A protein has these predicted regions:
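Conserved kinase catalytic-core segment
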Residues: 393-432
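Nucleotide/phosphate-binding site architecture used for ATP/NTP-dependent chemistry
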Residues: 1-407, 435-589
């Protein structure tokens, strides 16, 4: 059965708090299934209430706990009806819980439960040795996500257009990351004060501190750029000026007694990542600042690995990026970091300055839009990419995706194939360039290229890079960026580009359930990945792929190391009703 005949509510008509809860709880349910934390069964002909018709549901079980949610679409299942992979857009509001339910017992006595932290507590109570303090923290992060998500539903930023600035597009993001239950978390870690839902995180007042020159590591043109911003003689000779995010001041005061706070502030506009800001007086730069707040998986600080590698990687990026206009990179040419052998301390006082092309490209009639903003559906139906790019027919959506995929593979897959270098090309790190049409021109708008930013998450196979360029990426010991097995770099790009980027775009263009979107991607990939290649083996030949386990990683308190589980390879998806049948796997590092 395709879809569900069960009566469902349009979540856009719900109160903001209910919408915020379901945004996080639906992601949590998906994690419970895809990470193998609960067994999930597809039931095709079920009624959950007397007034409902028959439809399909997902039944999740763990010991005596049952979670039941109706389905808008058929997920990927095996011959016995076990659900192998689920997406939040497969789910319909609301979520129910019950005790010791089986397929034959539905409909049964069910209790509605859309609160993600309540669901997490029910699940954790049935797991062995689940640490109580860890559970408390995890639930607090879920609650934070709901609070901030609900507030954004109540007070969204104005809807952007192709004529909007890049920062307006950054700040227009509502739901953000498509699969992480803590997608909108703003969980402050003491001594940082709680970030209230109504706190203005878009417009910030930065604090200026200085450190003794021998207490920091400075790279690139950091001091020259800071001199453009500060009054002369603001900072004494022998000290280095550093801008600090307003939320981070308590950490700096408590961790760095040698820091001096100066009577000077700077107004800034925050990008979608919260910690990266644009200063209007220096529009061609973006300043990435640490902040002791957990957003999704980890605290948003900046490690010495990142501040060291960024400026030193520029000559390599100049060599490996395809010689075309397809991809520009936001060079991290300048940085500063506290000098401390304990990186857990040093990462709290740092700054990375990178190029920002948006103002320059706008003068050349190009809109620069963070990719995550394009796939948002503010009104719950049509994605922004369809509206602002005038993709009013399936043919135009197919053409948009075809061009997008072709450009993306040239930009991100070619450096991996030729040089063993994997960008972290997910939606927040990738900016889409679109030519702004003339007034009155309603023809479809197609992408012309990308900008990639944020290199702290890149993966590089140094031996492959050295063979192709004669260079190696300079790194500090213990860094997470080097991989000894080239397969790890392919797994990294698969996660960021295929699962976290193209998957969301294909769904936004309504080309997923038909299978047409994935047919386009496979066809394009076959041009680059040939039988016998590592990439072909991992991406096009294997029925399974690695899925990043967000909840399992939180349970093990991992942020630098990843935990994966085998799930169906989305690249081989043929369409609803034609799902691949195979077995999943156990989680492993």
């Amino acid at each position: 059965m395709t879809g569900s005949g069960l009566k469902s509510l349009d979540t856009t008509q719900l109160p903001a708090t209910s919408r915020g809860m379901f945004a996080s709880s639906s992601r949590l349910v998906v994690c419970l299934v895809n990470e193998g934390l609960m067994q999930a069964t597809y039931l095709p002909d079920v009624s959950l209430a007397p007034m409902d018709g028959l439809g399909s549901v997902a039944l999740l079980t763990l010991q005596d706990l049952s979670i039941v949610v109706s389905l808008a679409h058929t997920p990927q299942i095996d011959e016995q009806g076990a659900i192998l992979f689920l997406d939040r857009l497969d789910l319909q509001y609301p979520i129910f819980v019950g005790t010791m339910l089986t397929a034959s017992e539905l409909p049964a006595q069910l209790t509605e439960c859309n609160c993600p932290s309540a669901l997490m507590r029910l699940v954790a109570a049935r797991m062995d040795n689940f640490d109580e303090m860890l559970l408390k923290q995890l639930c607090a992060e879920l609650d934070s996500s709901v609070e901030h998500m609900s507030n954004l539903f109540l007070h969204p930023h104005p809807e952007p257009t192709l004529n909007s600035t890049a920062i307006e597009w950054e700040q227009s993001i509502i739901e953000g990351q498509g699969t992480h239950p803590m997608h909108k978390s703003r969980y402050a870690v003491a001594p940082v004060c709680r970030v209230k839902p109504d706190t203005n995180t878009s417009k910030l007042t930065l604090t200026l501190v200085s450190m003794p020159a021998d207490a920091v590591v400075v790279s690139g043109e950091f001091l020259t750029i800071m001199a453009k911003l500060l009054p002369a003689d603001m900072v004494p000779i022998g000290r280095v000026p550093i801008l600090v995010h307003p939320f981070q001041v308590p950490n700096v005061v408590s961790m760095f007694p040698e820091a001096t706070i100066h009577p000077f502030t700077v107004l800034a506009l925050a990008q979608s990542s919260l910690r990266t800001v644009i200063i209007p007086e220096l529009p061609n730069y973006a300043f990435k600042l640490p902040v002791g707040i957990r957003v999704t998986s980890a605290m948003r600080t900046i490690s010495p690995w990142t501040t060291f590698m960024g400026p030193r990687m520029i000559p390599i990026l100049d060599r490996i990026i395809p010689k075309s206009k397809v991809l520009k990179y936001a060079a991290e040419h300048s940085s500063v970091s506290a000098k401390n052998s304990n990186f857990d301390t040093a990462r709290h006082l740092a700054c990375v300055i990178r190029d920002d092309f948006s103002a320059t490209l706008r003068e050349q009639n190009e809109a620069v839009i963070v990719s995550a903003a394009l796939t948002e559906c503010p009104n719950g139906d049509v994605a922004r990419v369809i509206k602002i790019c005038n993709l009013n027919s399936q043919a135009s959506r197919v053409e948009f995706l075809s061009i997008f995929v072709d450009l993306a593979l040239k930009a991100f897959l070619v450096p991996l194939i030729e040089h063993g270098f994997s960008f972290e090309a997910h939606q927040q790190n990738t900016l889409v360039r679109l030519t702004i049409p003339q007034p009155g021109d309603n023809s479809p708008v197609y992408p012309s290229g990308f900008i990639v930013r944020d290199f702290g998450g890149v993966r590089v196979h140094q031996e492959t890079l050295f063979k192709s360029t004669g260079m190696r990426v300079p790194v500090l010991p213990g860094n997470p960026n080097e991989v000894t097995d080239l397969k790890e770099a392919y797994t990294r790009l698969y996660h960021s580009l295929i699962q976290m980027h193209l998957h969301r775009l294909i769904r936004a263009l309504d080309l997923h359930y038909s299978g047409k979107g994935w047919l386009i991607v496979r066809t394009k990939l076959e041009h680059y990945l040939k039988p016998g290649d590592i990439g072909h083996e991992l991406w096009l030949s294997s029925e399974t792929c690695k899925w990043k386990c967000f909840i399992r990683m939180k349970m093990k308190e991992l942020y630098k190391d990843y935990l994966y589980r085998d799930v169906p390879n989305i690249l081989l998806y043929k369409g609803e009703g034609r799902e691949l049948i195979h077995q999943g796997g156990e989680a492993s590092l």
